């Protein structure tokens, strides 16, 4: 037994020597009291999804715009100013935070978590799949899936229903159709296995990400949590691989015509880098990244759009008036849709108030300066996007829903750049941001044109929780009455 104190002392000395620069930097920053060795790991490990993002914002109010948390030997620094955010997102020496690497079982080494030369290559190869001209060609296909949703909602005859599931099915079908050319048809079945697999995978991965004890792959892969996750991943990967192989065979039979990529999957299958095609694993990683990130974030955003429309009926009236001269069918004029200021303002305000991705992180790889402070290698810099979007310095009355704050004709003053970054920013800005906005605008416009939406009188006051994305803890219940 006498050996344990000696081992503990040795471990402490080793950590102090190895992490001395980090410890010294951490001691120069304000933050909550930290235990020796453990730091604030116990506090972070106890944070529940429904308030974890609020705690990080409250700590800003207590300790200032830049504060630290310690998780054992790790140093987390939270940034809350628009200028520091701009610098961090443009710093070429930073890479994605190590925490995001825990998404690898689902999305592999896709754009969301890759960095360095691999990220640069993949970004360059994928960019053609998101050109405006190609996105425009998706409108009719998206419109078809939206019409199926309109039919489903109309069939409820004004009964209240929770909106997340029908939105998720519609968006999953639309995203897979336009990015892979495949028909999942999840809107026509109840309890689709792949939808359930996406939901469960997201919850299980988030449980791991907020538990410091599971940061080690070796430990995590020996838990029941991993076994549950692996079961869901088998469903997702088998479905995606089946679609990839089917399309690869079709292109092979066609002779792989150059310049004929019609979507993201075609772009990946036809891509060449230094004469070499992408591996099936690389293709699957990028497809899974796009589908998972796209459907989860856009579903959450659209849920809050419908909540806002139903809670504030005047927004429906104003938007419906703005839409009266816009065709919303296979001939939809996307220029006209993109030129509607109130639709744009409504979506911007939803993405600000209900910050779909509350935080993003970067890892220092060498000494770098941000906001006049020098950070050594090994620091995790967390950008609190929720805190930025709810900072009264940038947004007066920040917790109020005010689409007019984005309308110059209503006297709005533009907020500082990088105080509003729903799709992140800098070189790593979300490659699918225009696609996501296209989905949201088409869906919002069509539903407002078709229905009068009302919030259930039994809808509890909105309580948010952060999982992979921000969601309404108790769901959002809305009725859809035909105009």
Curated annotation (Swiss-Prot):
Q: Which domain of life is it from?
A: Eukaryota
Cofactor names from the entry are: heme
Record-linked Gene3D superfamilies: Cytochrome P450
Q: Does the keyword Oxidoreductase apply?
A: yes
Q: What is this protein called?
A: Probable cytochrome P450 311a1
Looking at its record, which EC class is this enzyme? oxidoreductase
Gene from which this protein is expressed: Cyp311a1
Please give the GO cellular component terms listed in this UniProt entry: endoplasmic reticulum membrane
Q: Which UniProt keywords apply?
A: Endoplasmic reticulum, Heme, Iron, Membrane, Metal-binding, Microsome, Monooxygenase, Oxidoreductase
Q: Which InterPro entries does the UniProt record give?
A: Cyt_P450, Cyt_P450_CS, Cyt_P450_E_grp-I, Cyt_P450_sf, Cytochrome_P450_Monoox
Topology relative to the membrane: Peripheral membrane protein
Family per record: Belongs to the cytochrome P450 family.
